[in-house]
Regions:
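Hydrophobic alpha-helical connector segments
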Residues: 60, 73-101, 155-159, 181
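Amphipathic alpha-helical packing segments from all-alpha helical-bundle domains
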Residues: 70, 74-75, 82, 117-144, ...
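Short coil/turn segments at alpha/beta junctions that flank glycine-rich nucleotide-binding fingerprints
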Residues: 25-29, 98, 144
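Helix-turn-helix
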Residues: 10, 14, 18, 22-56, ...
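N-terminal intrinsically disordered/low-complexity leader segments
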Residues: 1-10
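Amphipathic alpha-helical segments used for helix-helix packing
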Residues: 96-121, 171-172
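Short, basic, alpha-helical segments at the C-terminal edge of helix-turn-helix-like DNA-binding modules
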Residues: 63-69
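C-terminal peripheral helix-coil segments that are non-catalytic and often amphipathic
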Residues: 2, 82-94, 131-144, 161-188
C-alpha cells in the first residue's frame, strides 16, 4: 500500500468512527453529512470523495457490524461449549479495548428497530441471523451434555442478548467493569 493509499484508508476509518459516534447519539435521521464532516474536520465535499452519501456511509457501518457476529457463527472444530466460551471471551475483550465495538452493537440494535434507516439497510439486515446457527450449536452441546437443556433458540437469544446488553451498557459508560466472559457462557 502506498503512503497516499494508507492515508486515505486512515481517513476513511476516522470518518467511520466519527459517524458511528454520531449515529449512535443522534440516530440516522438526526445525523447530517455536515455533522460528520465537522466531526472529522473536513468539508462536506471532501467527505463525498470517501462516501457518496449518508446512506452509503451508514450501509458501510452496518456491513461492518454484520461481519463480526457472522464470522463467529461459521463452522468450527471447537466443541460447542468451547465455542461459546471463546466467542464471549473474544467479543468482551474487543468491547473493553475498542469503544468502536461496543458502539457497533448499539448501532446494529438501532438499525434493526428504527423505522428511519434506509431501505437498503433493512434489506441487508433481513438476512442477518446469528440466532439460528448458534441454536444449532447449542443443540449439539445439549446432545453431548455440555449445554443445559432448554429451547436452543431461546438459549441462543439469551446468550447474544447478554453480550449485546453488556456492549450497550459499556458504550454509554466505559468506566464500568466488564463482566467476565465465563459468566456469559454460564447462561448455557
Amino acid at each position: 500500500m502506498t503512503i497516499r493509499e494508507d492515508q486515505k484508508e486512515k481517513r476513511k476509518q476516522e470518518i467511520l468512527f466519527a459517524s458511528l459516534n454520531l449515529f449512535v447519539q443522534k440516530g440516522y435521521s438526526g445525523t447530517t453529512i455536515k455533522d460528520i464532516a465537522g466531526a472529522v474536520g473536513m468539508s462536506v465535499g471532501l467527505l463525498f470523495h470517501y462516501f457518496a452519501s449518508k446512506e452509503e456511509l451508514y450501509l458501510a457501518l452496518v456491513t461492518l457490524g454484520m461481519e463480526g457476529p457472522m464470522s463467529s457463527v461459521q463452522p468450527t472444530p471447537l466443541e460447542p461449549m468451547a465455542f461459546f466460551e471463546t466467542t464471549a471471551e473474544r467479543i468482551l475483550s474487543y468491547i473493553k479495548s475498542e469503544p468502536f465495538v461496543a458502539k457497533m452493537f448499539v448501532l446494529m440494535q438501532q438499525a434493526f428497530y428504527s423505522d428511519d434507516v434506509p431501505a437498503g439497510v433493512k434489506t441487508l439486515l433481513s438476512d442477518f441471523d446469528v440466532y439460528t446457527p448458534t441454536a444449532e450449536m447449542i443443540q449439539l452441546g445439549q446432545l453431548n451434555g455440555t449445554i443445559r437443556q432448554g429451547d436452543p433458540l431461546a438459549l441462543s437469544i439469551a446468550y447474544w442478548g447478554a453480550i449485546s446488553g453488556v456492549a450497550e451498557t459499556l458504550s454509554m459508560n466505559a468506566q464500568l467493569p466488564c463482566p467476565q466472559s465465563d459468566w456469559i457462557a454460564d447462561i448455557l
